[in-house]
Design a protein with these regions (language model features):
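Structural/interface elements that position substrates and couple domains in central-metabolism enzymes
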Residues: 20-131
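Polybasic, lysine-rich low-complexity intrinsically disordered segments
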Residues: 4-5, 19-20
Length: 132
C-alpha cells in the first residue's frame, strides 16, 4: 500500500480524523472478445484521485467507450502503454470482466482484482486466482 492520507469528515459539527490508505489503482484495457467497456470513467478517476489514490490507465482503455486518454489525464490519471505495465504497478486492478488466460500470469500475490468473477464455469481462472 502507498502512503497514509489524513481525511477530515464533518458530521453534525463534529470533526473526525480517519486514517485511510491511499492505493495505486490500475485500469487495464479489456481484452476479452467483444468487450468494449472500461471499468472506470474519467469522472471515476477524478473521485479517486481527489481522495488521494493514484490511478494508472492503460493507453486506449476507454476509447471504445468514448473516453480518450486525454480525458483520463485531465482528471488526474497517468497513462501507461501496456497491460503489463498496469498490472506491474497497481495494488488493485479494476476490470469490467474477469481476467482471461493471458492475464493470469500478470496478477501478483496480494494484488486485489476488483471485477465480476464467474468461477463456476472457469476452472483455470479459479486455479489461477487461488495461486495469486
Amino acid at each position: 500500500m502507498s502512503e497514509k492520507v489524513n481525511l477530515y469528515f464533518t458530521d453534525y459539527n463534529c470533526v473526525k480524523l480517519l486514517k485511510i490508505t491511499a492505493m495505486i489503482i490500475g485500469v487495464p484495457k479489456e481484452i476479452k472478445n467483444n468487450e468494449n467497456r472500461v471499468a472506470l470513467t474519467p469522472a471515476g478517476v477524478m473521485e479517486l484521485t481527489r481522495r488521494g489514490h493514484e490511478v494508472y490507465v492503460q493507453s486506449t482503455a476507454g476509447v471504445n467507450s468514448g473516453f480518450p486518454d486525454e480525458e483520463y489525464v485531465a482528471q488526474g490519471a497517468k497513462i501507461l502503454p501496456t497491460i503489463e505495465d498496469v498490472y506491474a504497478i497497481a495494488e488493485m486492478i479494476v476490470k469490467v470482466k474477469e481476467p482471461i488466460a493471458p492475464e493470469y500470469k500478470l496478477i501478483r500475490k496480494g494484488q486485489i482484482v476488483f471485477t465480476y468473477f464467474h468461477f463456476a464455469s472457469e476452472k483455470d481462472l479459479t486455479e489461477a486466482m487461488l495461486k495469486s
